[in-house]
Regions:
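Serine-dependent carboxylesterase/thioesterase catalytic core
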Residues: 121-124, 128-218
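N-terminal secretion-targeting helices of virulence/extracellular proteins
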Residues: 280-459
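Short amphipathic alpha-helical segments that mediate assembly, nucleic-acid/protein binding
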Residues: 6, 27, 49-50, 58, ...
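Long, contiguous hydrophobic alpha-helical segments, chiefly transmembrane helices and signal peptides
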Residues: 95-97, 108-109, 144-145, 149-155, ...
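N-terminal low-complexity, Ser/Thr- and acidic-residue-enriched intrinsically disordered segments
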Residues: 1-46
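A conserved cap/lid and substrate-binding interface adjacent to the catalytic center
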Residues: 35-142, 161, 165-171, 180, ...
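Conserved aromatic-histidine-acidic binding/catalytic patches
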Residues: 111-118, 141, 145, 425, ...
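Charged, amphipathic alpha-helical linkers/stalks
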Residues: 200-206, 212-329
């Protein structure tokens, strides 16, 4: 098997998130344990991944790999999720980072504007820790790889580690790119030649319709980008960014006539380029990256927080929270960017055509489709929020007046007075937040009204 194929298999393993393996176990020994786990049995949530692994492990190049340096046994947080797999026969060592874990979506958003993020830095710390603990030398071939967020981390490690002479290759599977400031920082630190030398080690392997690798600024050399066929049923949107679908095929059930997904242990063929969804995602990313950094930061933060909420978390792993300004950036700039990328680009029209099973949309959208923005609800909320702020301020004044009217002997009760003053301050902060939100919504309504005027002039 090629290094690329082995990397894809190991990235599939990472999503089982099995923490009961002991360092020193082979892949075959781990799979034997997993065979008794309900999640890996037919109908279990990881049956697809397990099927890929068991079939791939028939090849001793996979089955004999030895796991080591598991981050969960080294004191790292749940977001780091990394380990190494070594081949005793060839001496090759694979350093593998799992994709976006619990609480990591906001960190993805920060990577769109920041030079580095907390989770990227922890990934680097893990790599250098593993090198020093394991006494890894130049005699071993070292491969760094990861999928999605893990692919971004693998690239970051390749570009940032002080042990750059140990990294022979990096396989980025569906991983996003970086901010302008991150790239500028590397160029300044290493010089143009040093920057190019490091990034030439990176190979990008992307699903044909993956929608994550296009985010940010790619540092993968264009001649080292490959797209893999990922047959995904239309209703399974998440499958386009799922590494196991690089091992999938759609087969017709002879009994029902419907197509079902079947997983195997061999990587699918490469295809010439992106599919319709992948091309649209790239166009949308271009619109986002053209925004001023502060607006882009707000849009990215909102999108990533929505992804985090989908997983049941209200804050990021490192305590990241949305601000009113972030939400305002998304509504005023992010939604219009999505509109432009869907309706005003060829990639967006092709994506819609594929979604609705039509062959093509007219290149001239004028007279064929109208985007209607009903901002009356937002406008109504402006006044409602303003009235609510007034009511809160009234309550604040009542609390302060009550505190002032207290008899002297009661005012000497330090705990009571402090409680009343604290409540008044809390109410004041709440009123200020409501007023800020009201003002923000008012500005957004104005922006949409101006956009409607501009659109009406086009028709």
């Amino acid at each position: 098997m090629t290094e690329e194929e082995i990397s894809l298999v190991l990235n599939t393993f990472m999503y089982i998130d099995y923490k009961e393996a002991d360092d020193g176990m082979t892949m075959n020994e781990i799979l034997e344990e997993l065979s008794r786990h309900p999640d890996c049995q037919e109908g279990g949530i990881h049956f697809g991944e397990y099927t890929v692994l068991t079939q791939a492990a028939r090849n001793p190049e996979i089955g004999s790999l030895v796991i080591d340096n598991q981050s969960c046994l080294m004191g790292y947080d749940s977001g780091t999720a990394a380990c190494t797999f070594g081949s005793e026969e060839t001496g090759t060592l694979y350093v593998v980072y799992r994709g976006t874990g619990d609480g990591e979506w906001p960190d993805n958003g920060l990577g769109m504007t920041a030079e580095s993020t907390r989770q990227q830095e922890r990934a680097l710390e893990y790599f250098e820790d593993a090198v020093e603990r394991g006494g890894i030398s130049k005699e071993r071939r070292v491969i760094v790889t990861g999928h999605s967020k893990g692919g971004n981390k693998a690239q970051f490690v390749t570009m940032s580690t002080k042990y750059d002479d140990l990294v022979d290759a990096c396989y980025n599977i569906d991983g996003q790119g970086f901010s302008e400031s991150a790239i500028a920082g590397w160029k300044e630190e290493y010089g143009r030649d040093g920057y190019e030398e490091r990034r030439r080690r990176i190979t990008g392997i992307f699903g044909e319709n993956d929608y994550v690798n296009v985010l940010g600024n790619s540092i993968v050399p264009e001649d080292q980008v490959y797209y893999v066929k990922t047959p995904v049923q239309v209703k399974n949107f998440a499958g386009y960014h799922d590494v196991k679908y690089m091992f999938a095929s759609l087969e017709q059930d002879p009994r029902t006539g419907e197509y079902v997904t079947v997983f195997g242990g061999t990587k699918n063929d490469y295809v010439p380029g992106r599919g319709d969804l992948g091309s649209y995602a790239a166009a949308l990313s271009c619109f986002l990256m053209q925004m001023p950094p502060e607006q882009r930061d707000g849009c990215a933060a909102t999108l990533m927080q929505l992804m985090e909420l989908g997983g049941g978390r209200k804050t990021g792993l490192n305590g990241e929270k949305l601000t009113l300004s972030d939400i305002g950036d998304f509504i005023s700039a992010g939604i219009p960017a999505i509109y432009r990328s869907v309706f005003l680009t060829g990639q967006g029209r092709d994506m819609l055509a594929a979604a609705f099973h039509q062959k093509t949309f007219s290149q001239d959208m004028k007279g064929h489709m109208i985007l209607m923005t009903d901002y009356s609800l937002m406008a109504g909320q402006v006044q409602a929020l303003s009235q609510m702020a007034s009511q809160v301020r009234k309550r604040m004044r009542e609390v302060r007046e009550t505190a002032d009217r207290l008899p002297c002997f009661v005012k000497n009760n330090w705990i009571l007075c402090r409680s009343l003053k604290g409540e008044a301050q809390r109410l004041e902060r709440e009123a200020e937040s409501l007023e800020e939100l009201s003002g923000l919504l008012e500005e957004i309504v104005k922006l949409y009204m101006e956009r409607d005027v501009k659109v009406s002039q086009l028709w």
